[in-house]
Amino acid sequence: MATRFLLISLFLFFSHPALALDQESFAMCISKLRQAGLDAGLPAQVISQHLDDVKLNEKVVELDRSQPEFTSSFADYFTRRVSEQRIEKGREKYRSHRQLLDTLTREYGIPGHYLVAFWGLETNYGGYLGNIPTLDALATLTCEGRRGDYFQGELFNALRILQAGDVDVSQMKGSWAGAMGQTQFMPAVFLKHAQDHDGDGRRDLWGSSEDALASGAHFLQALGWEREERWGREVHLPEGFDYQLTGFSNKRSLADWAELGLTLPNGSPLPSAEMEAAVIVPAGHQGPAFLAYHNFRVIMGWNRSESYAIAVGRLADRIAGAGALSQAPPQAPRLDREQVTRLQRILNEQGHDAGKEDGLMGPGTRKAIARYQQANDLVADGFPGEEVLTRIGILP
């Protein structure tokens, strides 16, 4: 009877996406994970040595379940991440690591200023790696149950890293979501792409900048980085540009974009290279516009955020000596989740299909805003600016 009760309890625990996690249910979960680890081929000694000491981390649960109270604009995101301080520090790191970076460029085809940009955005050039024990974070997220299968796999991958001797468990710390080291790799990415470039017998992404930068280069090469291409560039859009041509579903050759009137910010013609690109306008028609090349999508293989990809590309440009954007991104009104939900409801009621009314300003909501703008003779850029929000009735 006791065994049957335990099995029923475990089934209910793992099948419920949002059950509160307490010490008792966490202990039951760890008991199940021990057997699952054995079934996955992990040695009993490794499981016992490390799972016996894992602890429930309530902060991790809180962070995983929390949602931002307000929307965050591209201007906020970009300004924080591509700051003058980060640019200057990136240039210093590029100079001090130049010999290594040139070697990595020859080996992997990734220009050094891009590697330094990833390094800067992920951990401020190794300055802050996160201080949450990785096993505690991954075990907590596994047992919380919302994405249990994914985090169970990452927990077992972390145990394999410890089994290989790349890091001591006391040093295996990182973000609340389990990202680790100077490049903030998840364990699965670590196992596939971490490199022992300094030759000390360990893939040490915590203490060795050389290993970390080489690992980033290996990952980007595997994602399909094109050696001779840049990430993209800022461009100037002509008056009357059709913003329905933006986005990755509308890739065109540079020659085609030039025919449509696109130029460099100073008015010079676009390069004549044989490549395709998409137009990205993260802050609407009053903000900067970018052509995104193949390597832009490679950057999104590291982090799926378009804003992140632009930040990496522009930080790399600035580290290499480029100037600031010709057009600074404008601030968008800060909306709370209730306001975004109301916006989605109004757009849906008017037939513009914003999708689920969840209070999150995602791509579906942006497309619905563009449809509203087009129907009301506004510039249909999908940007939630003050004018459109006032006309819809979200702002006074």
Task: Show which residues each predicted segment covers.
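Acidic, Ser/Thr/Pro/Gly-enriched interdomain connector segments
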Residues: 293-306, 314-359, 395
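Acidic helix-start/capping segments at beta-turn-to-alpha-helix junctions
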Residues: 47-70, 119-123, 133-136, 234-239, ...
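Short acidic, glycine/serine/threonine-rich helix-capping segments at coil-helix boundaries
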Residues: 335-340, 348-392
